[in-house]
């Protein structure tokens, strides 16, 4: 097939990006994310992103934050996209140039985010293992956040730090 015709998502692509950021920034992606992004929107003050045995951030999954911080992350991303900052321009370009995945749901993929048509307009969607979704609907200026868990999901102990998140419920 011709380059750019169809996207074949693979987690190793995201992992390669994590290794690249680690090399350029001189720190794990999780630390870079915390210092450069999370510190700007994180209100609860706790996030965790799993690393492999070599210390490389597992960039394709297991970024854990409170629901409030996930919503704040969505708001932050929408503000960045509107302001056309470097980060916002990156995601805008990804949405505008997203490549068809061939999935029956009509999804596309662009620059580390999924793109779905919502009411006829392409919108950025973050999707996680086990049933997490965040839809950034810029047309209505709303964020749809769904945090769920499939009982059949067997990708390690996602709840090893649940106590740190539960502390934020008071």
Q: Which stretches of residues belong to each language-model region?
A:
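Catalytic-site signature segments of enzymes, centered on catalytic residues
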Residues: 1-61
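A structural signal for well-ordered alpha-helical scaffolds and beta->alpha junctions
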Residues: 13-14, 30, 66-70, 87, ...
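Active-site-proximal alpha-helical segments within enzyme catalytic domains
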Residues: 13-20, 59-83, 132-149
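Non-transmembrane alpha-helical segments in soluble domains
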Residues: 18-22, 30-34, 38, 71-78, ...
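Active-site Gly/Thr loop motif
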Residues: 44-47, 91-148, 152-153
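A beta-strand-loop signature enriched in Asp, Gly, Thr, and Trp
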Residues: 48-58, 77-102
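Carbohydrate-binding/catalytic loop surfaces
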Residues: 51-65, 109-120
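Short, gly/Ser/Thr-rich active-site loops of penicillin-recognizing serine hydrolases
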Residues: 154-170
